[in-house]
Amino acid sequence: MTPKTPRPPRPTTIVDAPRLSKHLGVDLVLASETLQYTGSFKFRAAYNVASHVKQSHIMTASSGNFGQAIAYACALFGKRCTVVMPASAPKIKVDAVREYGAEVDLVEVEKKSRLERLGELAKQFPDAYVASPYDDPLVIEGNAGLARELFALELDLDFIIAPIGGGGLTSGLVKAVEESGKKIDVLAAEPLLSNDAAQSFRAGHIVALAEESNTIADGARVLRIGDNNWKILSDGLTEVIEVTEDQIKEGVRLLFALANLKAEPTGALALGAVLAQPDRFKGQRVCCVISGGNADPALYARLVEGI
């Protein structure tokens, strides 16, 4: 049931995981967005978009989490919502988008990209607002709220690590850090199989992948970082850490076994970055943003069992 009064985003859940910290040799803080409305940090951005734009119809392309988030946010504000999703998206995410009241347009990404299909729909509905899951100032500002919550808790952090796809979350974090004047390094964790952001930082300009990858971290299957995001990240982000598929899987398993947290593969990327560079973070105060928990049940069961 949709509440009569729109609900703003929930504060992030801070998890102290002493067993996981001991296992890694890191003073670890987990900022879990798995209990956020719609199960991921994406609701922060979606709420900010739906509450600010005047259009009554919002369209987007999403691998799932932003689709769920914008669908629910649109329902809160009485707006129509259309979400273009890859046909390969986890069924749990497709079903959830529909259950929140949005129309889902599935596309075979091997034949046509999500953005191409979104462009076609935008021509059909010229009065609709086309929301990028990441390349939108309203999205970036919505995500910045997460860092501001961390600052209010005075956690004395050395690093904040967050997953990166298009750059919406990390650019929001960097924006908030820069505005605060705090000396905290913001790092991005990216699948090695979908490393457009890492390639971009090495090249000094945006590099696009030729096609979407098949990384298990489906929320990071993007072709390139966003223009608005690059403007912020190119100067403010400390580094992009590339994470292997095995490290992503191990991150999911460790969060379950040692922190009692259910994270989807994309949500475990930040912990995967710690696994990728263990010596760098020894003894450091590190906040890993666990960005979401919308895992396909069958896949999740295999991951936690180490299959």
Annotate the PLM regions:
Residues 1-307:
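PLP-dependent amino-acid enzyme catalytic core
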